A protein has these predicted regions:
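Short C-terminal tail/terminal secondary-structure segment
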Residues: 78-81, 155, 166-179
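Alpha-helical segment proximal to the catalytic Tyr-Lys
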Residues: 58, 102-106, 163
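Residue(s) in the substrate-gating loop at a strand-loop-helix junction
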Residues: 73
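Active-site helix of classical SDR
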Residues: 53, 89, 97
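A conserved structural motif in NAD(P)-dependent oxidoreductases
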Residues: 139-150, 161
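Short, small/polar-rich loop/turn modules that mediate ligand/substrate recognition or access, typified
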Residues: 19, 105, 110, 165-167, ...
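Substrate-binding pocket helix/loop in short-chain dehydrogenase/reductase
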Residues: 29-30, 37-42, 124, 135
Length: 179
């Protein structure tokens, strides 16, 4: 991670906008979840965010500008049966973002989260028709979101129009959870 940050600095002139969007799931009932499944999800979904953000924050602080956008999940706020590891990682990302936002806001660096609900993706393509029907029934807009809708939120948070927005979580979920 350190060499990646150094290369970005020397070859690209630095990173002004960081979008942390890595994530995996290894779902299972809490009482049956293995340490390996717990650790794997937290490593990818939370620890990698910590490590990469830590390395890229120092140069942003020197430049006195940056936008850090963490893609979390609605289940990081609401919880979800069978996803204790994923929910814990995504909730941790929200807490990390709020803490970091308070630490570095004075350096003109914003830190925010986007919490998508059900978005058309390879993950939701795996759901059967009955599961999709149940999900749609819980979403007031009666459809899944699109990657473009999530990207539009990221574009806003990266823009000058969001210069006074920090420590926030934008929920992109069609009204599924009105928080």
């Amino acid at each position: 991670v350190k060499s990646l940050a150094e290369r970005a600095e020397t070859e690209l002139g630095g990173v002004d906008i960081l979008v942390n969007n890595a994530g995996i799931t290894k779902d299972g009932l809490f009482v049956r979840m293995s340490d390996a499944d717990w650790d794997a999800v937290l490593e990818v979904d939370l620890t990698s965010v910590f490590r990469l953000t830590r390395e890229l924050t120092h140069p942003m602080m020197r430049r006195r500008f940056g936008r850090i956008i963490n893609i979390t999940s609605i289940v990081g706020v609401t919880g979800n049966p069978g996803q204790a590891n994923y929910c814990a990682a995504k909730a941790g990302m929200i807490g990390l973002s709020k803490s970091l936002a308070q630490e570095i806001a004075s350096r003109n660096i914003t830190v925010n989260c986007i919490a998508p609900g059900f978005i058309e993706s390879a993950m939701t393509d795996k759901l059967n028709d009955k599961q999709k029907e149940t999900i749609m029934g819980a979403i007031p807009m009666r459809r899944m979101g699109t990657g473009a809708e999530v990207a539009a939120s990221a574009l806003f948070l990266a823009s000058n129009e969001a210069a006074y927005v920090t420590g926030q979580t934008i929920h992109v979920n069609g009204g599924m959870a009105m928080i």
